[in-house]
């Protein structure tokens, strides 16, 4: 029984990896059908539906992976790092680095892969970025508590600016067919970002 469950889990993972790889390839710039996905995995469409009731559930699983990966690591950054600018830098690098290592998933993060899918999926991605923005805003607000001095500008405005930088780099990565890496020249960009915050 356990062996059958492992086989099923492995097949599910294989399907999700195939979908992510298709999103990374030139197929990702078009709608991915279950027929194309099944052919890529080497199974029938019926076999796909034994593991996932719909393509939407496949995207749900990938979004869940993105959420878990980013939010759990953001929580670790907040636990381990206390200095405001280091926290912000590490959170931005986390999001950009995750996207760089997972180009297919970046198409989901930018909404590009979800254009032909259910609106609910885009809503989940919107929520993810709202949660990241909320974490950035919280880090910015805590500076006043930690250092006794906050920022000149409103923390909500600054958090939006930081997130817009991230989203812009992800969009550029997808638009360039993954040629311009999100972390490219980050060390040169970081002082410019810090200057905007102060």
UniProtKB/Swiss-Prot annotation:
Pfam hit, one: SlmA-like_C
Family, as annotated: Belongs to the nucleoid occlusion factor SlmA family.
GO molecular function, one term: transcription cis-regulatory region binding
Name of protein: Nucleoid occlusion factor SlmA
GO cellular component, one term: cytoplasm
Xref: PROSITE patterns: HTH_TETR_1, HTH_TETR_2
Cited function: Required for nucleoid occlusion (NO) phenomenon, which prevents Z-ring formation and cell division over the nucleoid. Acts as a DNA-associated cell division inhibitor that binds simultaneously chromosomal DNA and FtsZ, and disrupts the assembly of FtsZ polymers. SlmA-DNA-binding sequences (SBS) are dispersed on non-Ter regions of the chromosome, preventing FtsZ polymerization at these regions.
Coiled coil: 119-144
Portion annotated as DNA-binding: 33-52
Keyword annotations: Cell cycle, Cell division, Coiled coil, Cytoplasm, DNA-binding
Cytoplasm recorded as keyword: yes
Domain HTH tetR-type: 9-70
InterPro entries noted in UniProt: DNA-bd_HTH_TetR-type_CS, Homeodomain-like_sf, HTH-type_TetR-like_transc_reg, HTH_TetR, NO_SlmA, SlmA-like_C, Tet_transcr_reg_TetR-rel_C_sf
Subunit structure: Homodimer. Interacts with FtsZ.
Localization in the cell: Cytoplasm, Nucleoid
